[in-house]
Regions:
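Charged, amphipathic alpha-helical stretches
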Residues: 1-123
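Short helix-coil junctions and helix-kink-helix linkers
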Residues: 28, 451-464
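Basic amphipathic alpha-helical segments that dock to polyanions
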Residues: 83, 87-88, 320, 336, ...
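Long, mid-chain structured domain cores
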Residues: 88-273
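Long, internal scaffold/assembly segments composed of regular secondary structure
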Residues: 222-363
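Long, low-complexity, charged/polar intrinsically disordered regions in eukaryotic proteins
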Residues: 339-424
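Positively charged, polyanion-binding regions of nucleic-acid-associated proteins
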Residues: 423-443
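C-terminal engagement modules used by replication, chromatin/transcription, nuclear envelope/ESCRT
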Residues: 470-498
């Protein structure tokens, strides 16, 4: 690859190696996915490694054919009649389809037990689908302090997502029923992971980004399993994963924007050497105000996605330009290496500014304006991912209108054009309160909840908690105690057994 190759096609396979192999590179690239799709894909990533994401729709169609073959003998009889099992699959386990998919025939089931993920929960009905479960794996990799700790959490996740004697009767029966219906299905076993050693260093403990808090929250969610039924626990786990994955993607978008702005400053004459600590604080650490609670957020998410694309396009062009000038460029995988990168720019900015960099960038921005405006491609996919993963599931079926209570975005109104506001559903609140009080032995200040959400880039005013909709929902769920001495007059209570 070369600078000329990049100028011909800046998106497909032409990234500079100093960028492509760095953890700031967003991979896997997110696309459309509902929360059920992310959860089903996580089952496949952690325990069904031999089940390719693209095979799920085909396996679902084959499974459906077997269910509809009422007059044909079953190869292996289950514990219940075929008609009853059909009712379970199509009614009890039914998950809402997107409004534009209502007329399409494919299995859409709630991923309560592992074997459901063999037949349902692919991001696309076609065979060409991305793997949301690998995004969760990537966050575990980035958020853990070492490869050994990442592997330990991955193992704990597999054990918790497995169905064993500690699960309730319904979950054990359901998993056994699916397995008996298709004894030749892919075996459920832990996927072996090759963890990246290049993500960890002395800086890790000093940096603050969503993946770091996510691994702690994931551990807290795993500990909650014994306090509730399987379906309830999957809902809690689902809420934690929804918040973590989207916050991770938006953080990377924000990081790119800040890194590119610092790069522009250096090209314009600002001194590059500010120190790795300052780079960590102002470029890498999460912006605790990415999104505001209760506000309309989709325009902001679009802005983040657009800024990410602009920064990615420009940074890679600059990296290729510096390589053409003979520079040996560091991989952008640490604050120290980012500092070295900025120092190289400072040293060679005269050559960069006198060359074709700025005119080439202007040409690329003009040519790729639809992509940069998120009207197609990567940016559009990021917006779809955030909207459908965080947003409350919409359904044309009245019986499924209340299916999703773990949402983080809710529509203000019934019209198709109604805005999406950042508002937590009841299950999402239970999950977040449990996680922020994971080490608490009793009631704690509501500031812990605000600080916890800020770690994911969500700003919540402490004074608004008691007075607003969030405070009312906390009271309804029995998660607060009135205390005149406490901040805002209320204290948070752990929702589950510690």
């Amino acid at each position: 690859m070369s600078l000329n190759d990049y100028l011909k096609d800046p998106w497909q396979g032409s990234m500079h190696k100093a960028y492509e192999s760095a953890w700031i590179h967003m991979r896997p690239a997110p696309e459309f996915a509902t929360s059920d799709v992310v959860m089903a894909s996580l089952y496949r990533a952690v325990g069904f490694k031999d089940c390719a994401e693209g095979l799920v729709p085909k396996e679902g169609r084959e499974f459906e054919k077997r269910l509809q073959a009422a007059k044909k003998p079953q190869p292996i009889s289950g514990q219940i009649g075929l008609d009853t099992f059909r009712t379970i699959v199509h009614a009890v386990l039914e998950s809402p389809k997107q409004p534009n998919q209502s007329s399409k025939r494919f299995l859409q089931m709630s991923p309560i037990v592992p074997d459901v993920a063999l037949y349902s929960g692919s991001a696309r009905i076609s065979s060409n689908s991305w793997k949301p479960g690998l995004l969760v794996r990537r966050m575990i990799e980035m958020g853990s302090a070492s490869p050994e700790k990442a592997e330990l959490l991955w193992t704990r996740l597999f054990n918790a997502m497995s169905v064993d004697e500690t699960d309730d009767v319904w979950a054990r029966w359901l998993q056994d029923e699916f397995r008996q219906r298709n004894p030749g299905a892919t075996e459920w076993k832990q996927a072996v992971s090759d963890w990246d050693n290049g993500l960890w260093g002395e800086e890790h403990a000093e940096l603050h980004f969503p993946a770091r808090i996510f691994v702690l929250d994931l551990e807290a969610a795993l500990c909650a399993k014994e306090s509730m039924t399987r379906r309830q626990w999957i809902s809690i786990l689902d809420a934690v994963i929804r918040l973590g994955t989207v916050s991770h993607v938006l953080w990377l978008c924000s990081l790119h924007e800040r890194l590119w702005q610092r790069t522009v400053d250096v090209l314009d004459g600002v001194k590059a050497s500010t120190g790795a600590v300052e780079i960590g604080n102002f470029i890498i650490n999460v912006d605790r105000r990415m999104l505001g609670y209760g506000t309309v957020v989709m325009p902001q998410i679009r802005d983040y996605a657009s800024a990410y694309l602009n920064a990615r396009l420009s940074l890679n062009l600059l990296l290729w330009t510096l390589e053409e000038l003979g520079e040996d460029l560091p991989v952008l995988n640490s604050a120290t290496n980012i500092e070295k990168f900025l120092e190289i720019i400072e040293r060679r900015r005269g050559d960069v500014n006198e060359g074709n960099f700025r005119s080439s960038r202007d040409d690329l921005v003009s040519r790729e304006n639809k992509t940069l405006a998120c009207k197609k491609g990567i940016g559009s996919n990021i917006i779809e991912f955030a909207r459908h993963t965080l947003g409350q599931r919409q359904s044309l079926k009245e019986s499924l209108r209340g299916y999703d209570q773990g949402y983080f975005l809710r529509k203000r109104g019934e019209s198709r054009s109604a805005s999406w506001n950042l508002l937590l559903g009841p299950v999402a609140i239970l999950a977040v309160v449990h996680c922020c009080l994971r080490e608490a032995a009793g009631p704690r200040s509501v500031r812990r909840l605000c600080d916890h959400l800020a770690s994911y880039g969500i700003e919540v005013d402490v004074d608004d908690v008691d007075k607003g909709e969030l405070g009312a929902l906390l009271r309804m769920l029995g998660l607060v105690l009135d205390s005149p001495d406490a901040e805002s007059g209320i204290l948070l209570i752990p929702p589950f057994k510690q």
